[in-house]
C-alpha cells in the first residue's frame, strides 16, 4: 500500500462525496453477471477489438478464503510474455490491495493467442510477507519471474515495509525454482528489460525517495548503478525503462507528489522524463509530462511507434480512475517527446498494471485489472473491494 489504511479512508470520504457527473460508468456489465471470460460490450474506441473478464474476482467474494491456494476477490498486477510458442500470463490474488502473506501469484499459458488460458503454476507468498508486482523476463532460454515481497506493514509511501525483490525461474513455466532474493532490502524492482545481453531495471527506494538503475548479466545477481531521479519531494516510484532504436534509454518516472497530490484527484499530475545514452552511466531528466501521471506503466513498440498503457487519473470526479492507452511521440532518441491519449479500456475503481504481448505486428493482447465497472467506485474504495483481471485485443493499425 502507498498510504496508511486510515489515511486512505480519511482521504476517500471527501472524494466520494464529490460530483462525479464527468465520469459516467463505462458500458460493460458487472463481471459477476456472467462467466469469467465472457465477451462484454466495450466503449467505442476503434482500436479495441474485444474485451472480456479473464479472472473473476466477483466469483470469489469471500473474505475468509485462503488466497495462497485459490483465486480470491482482489486480483491485480498483471504481466504477459511469449515463451516457447505460447502466451504466458501472471497476476497477484489477495483479499485486497493491503500488504499481507494471504496472497499468491498465478501463472497461466495460452496456446491459442490468448483466447483461453490454463493455469500452469501457483506461487504463494512467503509465510511472513506479501507478494506483488510480478514481471516476466527470459534468460538463456528459461522463463524468469521477478516479484516484490514486503512486510505486512501499513505505512505512508511504502515506508518501513522492507521490500525485497525476489526471482524464480523455470525451463517450462510449470516447474519453478524457489524464490530467492535478487535485490537489496528496501528497494523495489520495476520491470526488467534486456539490451545486448545485459538486463536492466529501475528500482525505487522504500519511502518512495529515489530511483536507481540496476543491471545484471545473468538475471540473478544485480548491481546498483547511477541514480535516475532523486528528488524525494516528488515521491518518485515505478519507473518504466524503454530502449530506443538509436540506443538511448528512456525512463518514465511516476511522481505522486505531495500528500495532497498522492491520490491524483487534485494538484499536479506529472511524469518525469529521464534519458541516458550508452553505456548508461548517468541520467538527465530535463522534461516531464504535465497533466499525465502514468501509474504502473508498461511501454511497447508497434511498427516504430511507442505506446504506453497506464492508470489514468480523472481529476474532479471524486477519485475515479481508468486504464488508458497512450502514444509517445516526438524525438524518440533523446527528446523532446509528447504524450497522446488514445482512450480507455473498460475499467474503474482500482485499475491498471497492464501486461502486453504481441500477436502480430499490429495486434497485441493486453491484460489489466479493474474494479466493478457499473459501480465505478473511487480508487481508494476500489483498493479494498473486488477486482477482476480483464484481457483485450487491440489493433493499432486503427490509430492514424
Language model feature labels by segment:
Residues 1-7:
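Bacterial N-terminal signal peptides that target proteins for export
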Residues 6, 131-134:
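Short, charged beta->alpha transition segments
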Residues 14-17:
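C-terminal motif of bacterial Sec signal peptides marking the signal peptidase cleavage site
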Residues 21-25, 29-73, 81-129, 137-295, ...:
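Beta-rich carbohydrate-recognition and catalytic domains
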Residues 356:
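Hydrophobic, well-ordered secondary-structure elements that form the walls
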